[in-house]
């Protein structure tokens, strides 16, 4: 899993981009975490609790995305994922959800989160 962090020089907004199959992680970092160091620390604390068996799993529901942490993996998905459709799609058509959900190992997620935290601290 590769990622890159940038800061928009005009708006000051922090941006995260992740490699294919993990794009939604970039959206979650950018839109749900942003530069909020307290929220970043909260997620890191929950990861430690899971790693030390003080907690089995944890979920953080955001405005647009939800983070689920378990012993072996992290999952980020759009809150709209899995909602029932009010209308029937034609037989050959389907909704594209691949960029609305991503899984990665808990340690990889923790490393990306620590990198994001460092990037934010240096940019503030």
UniProtKB/Swiss-Prot annotation:
A Pfam family (short name) is UPF0231
Q: InterPro entries from the xrefs? A: UPF0231
Taxonomy, superkingdom: Bacteria
Question: What protein family is recorded?
Answer: Belongs to the UPF0231 family.
Protein name per Swiss-Prot or TrEMBL: UPF0231 protein Sbal223_3655
Q: Which organism is it from?
A: Shewanella baltica (strain OS223)
Taxonomic lineage of the native organism: Bacteria, Pseudomonadati, Pseudomonadota, Gammaproteobacteria, Alteromonadales
């Amino acid at each position: 899993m590769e990622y890159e962090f940038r800061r928009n020089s005009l708006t000051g907004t922090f941006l995260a981009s992740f490699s294919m199959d993990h794009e939604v992680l970039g959206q979650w970092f950018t839109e749900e975490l942003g530069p909020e160091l307290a929220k970043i620390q909260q997620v890191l604390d929950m990861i430690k609790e899971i790693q030390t068996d003080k907690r089995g799993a944890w979920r953080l529901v955001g405005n647009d995305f939800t983070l689920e942490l378990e012993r072996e993996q992290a999952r980020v998905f759009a809150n709209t994922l899995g909602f029932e459709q009010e209308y029937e799609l034609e037989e050959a058509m389907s909704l594209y959800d691949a960029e609305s959900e991503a899984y990665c190992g808990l340690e990889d997620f923790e490393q990306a989160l620590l990198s994001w935290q460092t990037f934010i601290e240096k940019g503030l």
